[in-house]
């Protein structure tokens, strides 16, 4: 019995030894995998550096590099692959290109940088995309990373600003191509200081140039807005002590085409039951519409269907009597404030023919108010002042 009890600790020790041996094997396998991954990464790094050094790749080396990239993506290094690519491969390669021309100035710098860009854009960049083809579909892409590193390490770390500012500088076409291509690459964090520095270089070779904060031109002053809005409500309601200036607005001639007036289609059933059965169905009849002056309000057609304009009556003015037979009242019956708004010769196109129906008259005048032959308008009425004088114009802005 004692021998059996004495042998039991030995059996448990055997189990522990087996577990320890298995753990050691696993650790050894992990170390071997890491060593293999490191060897694969070193081979990829050597291949990429040789491309930057104009040595090229050996036969079938591109295929082996593709397989190495696929293997690395399956290991624990896969999640850090982009970081390794930026901090090691691309940074080292760009430093190799920069060190060859970093001490040049003036015209020699422009010519040397043009040659460097041609080599990078035509040879290095396609080869990088081929080597890291298995990484495609991830953001940022290999192309974006390579161009961003070229911008930050080479373009913005040379005396390029001084070279472009010289009066007799001859800018090679490759320099303009380089700046415009780099300008089209954006980072996920938005506009950065490096991007703004790049735009300051583009202004020296491209004029006019539409940048992030406006239009740059050598012949005209800087325009502070690339999307110019003509805000009528600010011209109507200026703040105290503020001087407003009108920005130059370039309008498209296509906005000056005559507008289409809607056709009022009558439904007999609703007309009998409710007294008004108008619905807008289609468009016809080309009509040139002039902008209706602000201030006309409360146009009524008859006692059964009353449609009011988007204006406000002057204080103390009573409700006007209804108008019959689809005609407007004569101008001498209007109040003094309204007579100043109308002129028989100036506003004659706004007054419809007497034979028109009341509904068509109202539709035409509403369309003339809501439309403007000068441009496209967006309604921002909620964010404006609710002053009665500006109720019609206050919610309209012309967008160019």
From Swiss-Prot:
Give start-end positions of Low complexity composition bias.
348-358
Region (Disordered) residue ranges read: 301-358
Q: Which GO terms describe its biological process?
A: TORC2 signaling
**What InterPro entries would the database entry show?**
Bit61/PRR5, Cullin_repeat-like_dom_sf
Locations of Polar residues compositional bias?
334-347
Q: Name one GO cellular component term.
A: TORC2 complex
**What's this protein's family per the entry?**
Belongs to the PROTOR family.
Described function: Associated subunit of mTORC2, which regulates cell growth and survival in response to hormonal signals.
The record's note on quaternary structure and interaction partners says: Associated component of the mechanistic target of rapamycin complex 2 (mTORC2).
Q: What is this protein called?
A: Proline-rich protein 5
This protein's encoding gene: prr5
